[in-house]
Amino acid sequence: MKKENKSVIIWLLSGCVLLFLMVVVGGITRLTNSGLSMTDWHLVTDTFPPLTDAKWQAAFDEYKKFPEYQKINIHNDFQLSDYKFIYFWEWFHRFIGRIIGLVFFVPFVYFLAKKKLDTSTIKKCIVLLAMGAFQGFLGWFMVRSGLIDNPDVSHFRLSLHLTFAFITFAYTLWVALDLIYPERNINKILPLRNIARYALAALLIQIIYGGFVAGLNAGLIHNHWPLMSDGEFIHESVFIEQSSLIKNLIEGKSGVQFVHRTFAYAVVAVILFLFFKSKKYTLTRTQSNGINTLVVFVFIQFLLGVFTLLYSVPLALGLIHQIMAFFLLSAMTYTLHRLSK
């Protein structure tokens, strides 16, 4: 690491921490059914929550016009105090998004003015800023889907929002790693790099399906392992909830859960393959540490997934499972970087 890059690295890693925090709060927002509490979006006027009783009541009255209240919460003795709870989590999620925007943009302008960024890093940072702006759009695009008729957001949009947050985090970490390890890696092992790429692709597919499971509440059924309900590996409901096999596998609760729980074995398998294949090569310390950490994390994540399913997605386990996915992606990004650069 070059000394002149230290402040830029700290900036990028701070962004990673904030992105991690935002996904954690996003997970709490989803698991507490708070995501539809703010029914519009304003860049400036939503910066702070309502500060008077009258403004709180006005926000609550506006919320009552939308499907989540009219079809669900109206039957649950839902009071203003309940509304304040769900409002807080959605507001906090958006507030962190605004902080992230400032943390990325203001120092970027400063580093540009001080000429602390080379041309390559400038281009990467511009991509990061664009990704952040697009992520904000995806968040509102997701929320809008739950404000029309169905009081649930589209699981496709939720998964897109979630997965793109993971990708933005991974790319931010990658840019930071480029500065932490500016020297070219003379121990670049192409076979391992290619396997790591497949592992990353498998992990991203699993994250996408994790979003599907979350959006459809598919973790609340077939709460058994290693088999589904009735002691079946593939329960009959996997094939009958939707009109076609493809629809069952991307829209049916049972089908989506089946893919997510089964594909977990594939993720574990490809990472184990990377681990055992790496034993045939002489690795650097960072390469070895990355692969070893990856193996530990994938087994922890697998077990968390099993227990989250068995206990029907309690808030704590569901959140820890999502957090562990972040750590797993971090280890995957680090490992691939050390095998590639």
Curated annotation (Swiss-Prot):
GO process annotations (BP): heme A biosynthetic process
Function: Catalyzes the conversion of heme O to heme A by two successive hydroxylations of the methyl group at C8. The first hydroxylation forms heme I, the second hydroxylation results in an unstable dihydroxymethyl group, which spontaneously dehydrates, resulting in the formyl group of heme A.
Recorded catalytic activity of this chain's protein: Fe(II)-heme o + 2 A + H2O = Fe(II)-heme a + 2 AH2
GO MF assignments: metal ion binding; oxidoreductase activity, acting on NAD(P)H, heme protein as acceptor
Identification of the protein by name: Heme A synthase
Pfam family, one: COX15-CtaA
Family: Belongs to the COX15/CtaA family. Type 2 subfamily.
GO cellular component: plasma membrane
Pathway: Porphyrin-containing compound metabolism; heme A biosynthesis; heme A from heme O: step 1/1
Highest taxon listed in the record's lineage: Bacteria
Obligatory cofactor(s): heme b
Organism: Flavobacterium johnsoniae (strain ATCC 17061 / DSM 2064 / JCM 8514 / BCRC 14874 / CCUG 350202 / NBRC 14942 / NCIMB 11054 / UW101) (Cytophaga johnsonae)
Coiled coil regions in record: none
Residues given in the record as heme binding sites: H260, H321
Quaternary structure, from the entry: Interacts with CtaB.
